[in-house]
């Protein structure tokens, strides 16, 4: 800023008259005059006017001189060394430069921060950080030095008093003292003087600062301890960090700390050795004999002395040398010690800081004390713990002054140590005296305030309750459009209160107070204002549990009467909601940005596809399916009806379709005939294709189309580009209406209709296919409109159909008794064989069970054949609206075999069906399964929720951060086969991914797809047609990004069908995609009503957990460790058969594998085997597979096994989601040899850190470190996260904070969780962009512009 601008008169700055007067009186006429004063002088001269002048001082960087800013000499010296001449330079300096300069002097930096706070200035963050938090470079944690704790403090707490029980005012120097922590009432001191002036003035009488009461939430105090105290975290947590550091056994160290034993510091004339631990008796004897000629200490003092005497550098050298000389067992303990010593040496921590002379006192706002009725107080338990410390500390002080006996003082010191232990972590200190008297449980210590679901991290930082929210029961809103929801007026009037007040102020030109008065009257003006403000203002609806991102979506509110929220029936599958009493929460996005995001990204009509597999998630269900099924039924006139009242019903049917084969000019003529009861919805009629606005071939347009009125009505909702849908086939949907349905002029229509088979009606599956096809061709908005049409048709025609269920619909299977007699005869035969000794009990049981299974299947088949096409129950099942074949078999056939409580099949089946009624014994055996279903549901829902939580935690920092990482590696995929069946096709696996190399036609050599080109559906079809079986694709598993992943390796975002955008939080989406069906799998168990079935969920979820947690599998399979040939399989010794394999390169070398008895062998003699191939049935141990076959094979195995579990339950999840989880399981490496790096052999570090260490060695031409990949379970992977905040908020909070504090760990805030915890924007979506991208070059501002800006502030 040029100097001449400082000669601007203060009168041009539009300041208030009293302020201008004060400036004039102080001799300040121009901006330059401010430079003649220090900040403190300006504050005293201007008093309350200082706050009005402050923005001007900031804009013009005044006072200019650094000496005038009330900074200490130390601060000014550091700033001068950085080349800063004045205040303007300081304001333009980046935060990174300042933090680096003040790294060794945090107290001086605090002073600088106070200055920035006063000026409301935040130094800009360096933009060399490519990714992560916008506002902060990093978050660091370390041990606090005693001086720092005193520096944080605003005063020493010396009294254990809290609040005066008569006046309810805090006691002086007590735990709630106003002098230390700030006033209880805004700008009012302890002697009740009020002063609404500028901050930072103190009452002359009581010494309390006149300031806001909110400072009581941030100001800390301290307690000066009379004796040093060991921090319990470093002593009592396992493994004890102090014991490892000092190389003393934990038990012995505890004895020293709790004053049981002594440690020799200086042996003097005694026979003791330094660091030798001696008992009380030995100490007394030595003291008696040698007096002060030797030094032995006990308690924390002794530990502090030992730590101070520790020479870190020397110890490191000695330990590193002894590493190579010792046995494996000793090496492990040396590495543990070395790790801790290195941590202290490399960080700015000192080991003696683990022993405390002073402890901080939490601000009283965070540990309140509230008076209750009847003179009692409700208080936070931490207050009791502080009181106990103060009591004991004061007592110790008194005893020391009185020179009490050594034993008494020692006992008091031990009690003080225990009191401080209880404050920091009371869970580990299970002493009776630290219990809550009323509830007899340990008091809640500071550690408990952080730990677990109710702790600070998970309860208050990662999830908060929000204002402008409501909750109500949901009911169906069939009249709503796709993007709407019905909000009760009573709720909306409160939810939209701020917007209504603003509207009232605008329309009536009144102030806030008057607007509030009108609002409280709730008259017509207010309701009219509400109608205005809800227009175009989306709201968010959420149903718990929110299993995936579709569990919270945006809607346009439509005001309704009543008290229930109305929900569009098509969105229920996404929320997994039904209308049997479910409740939903509603939230109002307040800012314009939030409203824009809700409308563009979260609106229901924009979220039609499921992120886990790209299939439509808004499929019609129940009544809607049934209505459309009924609408598209096609019936022949000459059909004969067999069941009850056959003759009459056949006659009615023929009369209904008496005009079959009639010709109509257009749909309206057909509708008129229907209204006049000339034809039925299902009657087969002819119509000219020209009358229908859909796609036909030229040849078809010359003929007549055979269809029904129902199908004409259904096709009316399709766009002109679609073919006319006359049958539920893929050909009709994708290509054209089949020519078979067209009648050439001159053909006999009756003959034509006789030969023509009737196509099936449109069921749920086909409706989904139509929606998917529609979505590919049209925009999202068009799709949502079409879905609304399907819904309206469905409800209308299911009402017209009037489909009901009656007893008459359920007819028992006619051949049932004969079949039962046959199977019973066969079972008698099996029993005879067993009695004659031809069968073992297990074989007999297996045969009997198979007989009953087969007979149930036979009855099921026969029953389905006997069902009439117009049977209402059959229609419900066939359409996919409700119920399955199994349900009908139980209703009308036989219930079949049941499971007992252990999950084994009971041999005696339930022969009756529900229609016939069950015997008491049959009913009893049915109850086991039903109960198991209910308990399974409850248990597995929790289990699945926990799995989702772990998955989210392990992947939360995976975000798409760049377009391409230029990886040259690929992942070869092929169709997934399980038990001879294809479970995931090659097309499904490659669609929406990028090719990692050129793919050519095997015969013609023509290029099908180039490297790094997207494989679309048509390209994927070309690859399949070319009979290519294996395709190399770009994969997340081979991504080169240091943090997050790149768009090319991820491919298409399944929720939008477009290439994934930078900033998409793909990690969380992957975790939700795998976790959400996990809950569905568990919940589906009870739908079969406990009927014995092979695919019960119990295999599902535990298996997924076993894979993701890398546990040893139960039925472990044996795998080959080499490439070779099976020489022989020796089964002679039936106890333990063995397989002999010879090596491929050396046929004379044999490897023998001894098998468990009775295992299924999967290989035969002379078979070739490769490393990692299964030799016996069972599950492979992942760690073994990784060791034998390498990373790629292990990754491939996990991917396939997870897919098998989900496909068995008919859930399809895209590979890319599972790949993200696997990517996180392989992110660490085990150091085998450290080379010249500072790494320690035997430790596990992330691949990124390993690469960095080796790159450094390459540059310096030194020896590289060697490591091998390891596989981590998702829980361990989460806990090993680079982010200490993310790991600490997941599990084992104290353990992670202990290690992080010792190492002085830095969290670079790359993940989502850590940014949520510190209250910043998450580095995903719009938050991923660098601040530099939002900055535009500006013209230098003129003085008048700056003055204007100041006035606005």
From Swiss-Prot:
It catalyses: RNA(n) + a ribonucleoside 5'-triphosphate = RNA(n+1) + diphosphate. It is an enzyme of class 2 (transferase). Keywords: DNA-directed RNA polymerase, Magnesium, Metal-binding, Nucleotidyltransferase, Transcription, Transferase, Zinc. Binds 1 Mg(2+) ion per subunit. Binds 1 Zn(2+) ion per subunit; 2 are expected compared to other organisms. GO terms for cellular component: DNA-directed RNA polymerase complex. Mg(2+) binds at residues 578, 580, 582. Residues 1-117 are annotated as: Unknown. The RNAP catalytic core consists of 2 alpha, 1 beta, 1 beta' and 1 omega subunit. When a sigma factor is associated with the core the holoenzyme is formed, which can initiate transcription. DNA-dependent RNA polymerase catalyzes the transcription of DNA into RNA using the four ribonucleoside triphosphates as substrates. This is DNA-directed RNA polymerase subunit beta'. It comes from Onion yellows phytoplasma (strain OY-M).
